[in-house]
């Protein structure tokens, strides 16, 4: 899931050193970067300001996550206003259902209790979660864990999408 982080770190340092727009692909000089580079250009600006590469990578993602969460909340609030009723509670429910979605795979982990070895595997086993349990052929990917955190282009695309929809 996080295999492209090295690529993004390379893009960030390359864009910071090139100081050209549109940026070029650092491995193939003279070739324009065809990958969505909004997030990496923002991170390269933060990197030029003198922050560490780690901070330059994480800080824009943090603000984009806040913008996406706020955008989903405000969009849900606007939709709930249209239908009437308790706006605030329904908007928070919409956020919970949208971002922390999943299936009923938790049954496989909780069928022997909260303190069983089955349940603790969620926290100790490599990528063994109630929504991604290969042994039972459960592959229900979570939007937050499988799309927004590891895929920077999706995160920044959604950060721009929700203000447009509102």
List each language-model region with its residue ranges.
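ATP-dependent phospho-/nucleotidyl transfer catalytic cores
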Residues: 163
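Active-site lumenal/periplasmic loops and adjacent helix-entry segments of GT-C-fold
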Residues: 1-160
């Amino acid at each position: 899931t996080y295999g492209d982080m090295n690529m993004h770190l390379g893009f960030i340092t390359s864009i910071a050193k090139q100081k050209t727009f549109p940026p070029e692909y650092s491995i193939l000089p003279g070739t324009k970067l065809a990958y969505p580079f909004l997030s990496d250009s923002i991170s390269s600006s933060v990197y030029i300001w003198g922050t560490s590469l780690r901070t330059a990578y994480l800080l824009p993602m943090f603000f984009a996550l806040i913008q996406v969460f706020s955008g989903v909340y405000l969009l849900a609030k606007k939709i709930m206003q249209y239908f009437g009723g308790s706006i605030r509670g329904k908007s928070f429910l919409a956020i919970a259902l949208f971002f922390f979605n999943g299936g009923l795979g938790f049954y496989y982990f909780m069928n022997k209790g909260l303190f069983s070895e089955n349940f603790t595997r969620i926290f100790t086993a490599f990528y063994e979660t109630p929504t991604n349990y290969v042994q039972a052929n459960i592959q229900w990917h979570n939007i937050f864990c499988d799309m927004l955190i590891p895929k920077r282009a999706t995160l920044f695309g959604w950060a721009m999408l929700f203000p447009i929809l509102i």
